[in-house]
């Protein structure tokens, strides 16, 4: 886990660092907020990772706090994404937008599953708050959106191949997600959720290139 955390932090920092030119004052302000939240999140995550390295386990509350912080980062990122479109006058095409939202949904599912796995024997707090959906409900939402993407007539041979590869990876963890109260397999879910997110990001790039 510690190695994966280090890699993820490096990737996150690189992506945030690539966001430089904003189209307006609103997006500039949101980017500054995002940068501040990221620095705080990064510090919390490093402390948690160091604790995991030295003790082999962590307390439940810091895990729950980090999951909530992750959700706040995602919400702020989505707000910045919308503001950039608004201020630039550019809108994202439908399938590009849907595939990007699907990537965020996969991340939410993975975060909730990891948090639940870490809270065995204790209370679990979803990253979406008290009124959020359960993991199996989120998994069902993921399947429905995948079906919608697959059925889109605008798909090309390339995007259909990408969708097929994503669906194959999804099958490895779908049962575990829908039966999350049974045997916990956090490493399996983390491994394949990362690959699914990578696949969805590649898919959104393919859609964006075709403006669909």
Predicted regions and their residues:
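Extracytoplasmic/periplasmic, Sec-exported soluble proteins
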Residues: 1-7, 26-29, 33, 58, ...
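Short secondary-structure transition/capping segments
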Residues: 131-139, 200-210
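Heptad-repeat alpha-helical coiled-coil/4-helix-bundle sensor or tether segments in soluble regions
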Residues: 3-61, 69-72, 139-182, 204
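Extended amphipathic alpha-helical interaction segments
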Residues: 59-163
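Charged, amphipathic alpha-helical scaffolding segments
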Residues: 64-76, 189, 196, 200, ...
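Short, charged/polar, low-complexity loop and linker segments
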Residues: 21, 53-54, 82-86, 212
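N-terminal extracytoplasmic segments of bacterial inner-membrane proteins
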Residues: 4-7, 41-46, 91-122, 168-178, ...
């Amino acid at each position: 886990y510690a190695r994966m955390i280090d890699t993820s932090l490096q990737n996150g920092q690189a992506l945030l660092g690539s966001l430089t030119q904003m189209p307006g004052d609103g997006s500039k302000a949101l980017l500054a907020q995002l940068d501040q939240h990221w620095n705080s999140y990064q510090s919390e995550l490093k402390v948690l990772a160091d604790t995991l390295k030295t003790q082999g386990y962590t307390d439940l509350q810091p895990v729950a706090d980090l999951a909530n912080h992750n959700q706040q980062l995602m919400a702020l990122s989505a707000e910045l994404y919308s503001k950039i479109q608004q201020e630039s006058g550019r809108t994202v095409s439908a399938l590009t937008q849907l595939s990007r939202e699907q990537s965020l949904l996969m991340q939410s599912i993975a975060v909730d599953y990891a948090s639940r796995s870490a809270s065995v024997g204790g209370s679990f707090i979803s990253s979406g708050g008290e009124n959020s959906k359960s993991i199996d409900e989120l998994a069902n939402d993921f399947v429905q959106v995948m079906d919608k993407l697959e059925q889109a007539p605008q798909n090309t041979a390339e995007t259909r191949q990408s969708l097929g590869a994503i669906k194959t990876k999804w099958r490895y963890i779908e049962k575990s997600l829908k039966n999350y109260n049974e045997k916990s397999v956090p490493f399996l879910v983390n491994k394949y959720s990362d690959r699914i997110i990578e696949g969805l990001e590649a898919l959104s790039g393919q859609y964006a290139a075709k403006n669909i």
